[in-house]
Amino acid sequence: LHEPPVDVRTGHAETLFESLEPGAGRRLRAYLDSASRIYGLAKEHFLYTDFRRPAALAHPDVLRALPALGPQLLGGLRSHVAARFQDPRLRQILGYPAVFLGTSPDRAPAMYHLMSHLDLADGVQYPLGGFAALVDAMAEVVREAGVEIRTGVEATAVEVVDRPAPAGRLGRLAARLPRPGAARGDEGRRRRPGRVTGVAWRSDDGAAGRLDADVVVAAADLHHVQTRLLPPGRRVAESTWDRRDPGPSGVLVCVGVRGSLPQLAHHTLLFTADWEDNFGRIERGEDLAADTSIYVSRTSATDPGVAPEGDENLFIL
């Protein structure tokens, strides 16, 4: 936390890296070229598949990339970065994106160096008005398409029955989606395939009801869906969840500040000097040290509409 700050800007990272470590600019160029290739491969063949069909992984592009992709799946991000850069600050810049994946650089596969393509090559985008503006824009688009959005309503149950999916286009869509019955239940045995018939709900004013549905897309926390919303005979046991590693949670602080903070950029990453101890405490579930890595977003540096004139809006992770 006591090193002089470095200013990382999209399109200028090679110059920065070279100034901190001779030869690092050239190595960063190769690093980002690899990150861009892996990102393109992931977006084209991995991001939009549910991996239910092996053929998705047998595409010629994927097979050609296996010699490079294999070691990146087996090796860790930390060692991948350390083999190319010596300066601790450069290692932290390239390793920290693992945090946004809910893990640490030594546990994340090296394949995730593709995150640096987004940070340092593509660049970070910010919607004026914050992400609330993005939500509003999406709501407008789906309403124009005939979608009804209900707020102040809690989904209390997903109803599932043991019978075949409907015929036709909706049935084919439902067959492609992961089924609640495909996971192991409380009894530890596989359940019969089923299909959803609806969703039960309860509103803030105490009213309750249900909606018929052929397909349910649940964007809630997966643990909540699998242990609370599904019918008892189709839930995933808590003992199963106890064996899973969901990744660390985060402490988020939203702060409105009177006065200006020009010393903060829109994005500021403050790294602790004892990088390994910081991640180790998180992984072991221990209390954090007094000096710990934090991320500060000063959105008012870019967007004048998020705070009164002369004041600041901060998001601290």
Regions found by a protein language model. Give the residues of each.
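Mid-domain catalytic core of redox enzymes
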Residues: 156-178, 188-308
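Generic recognition of stable, solvent-exposed alpha-helical segments in well-folded globular domains
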Residues: 23, 30, 76, 130-137, ...
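Rossmann-like flavin
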Residues: 2-107
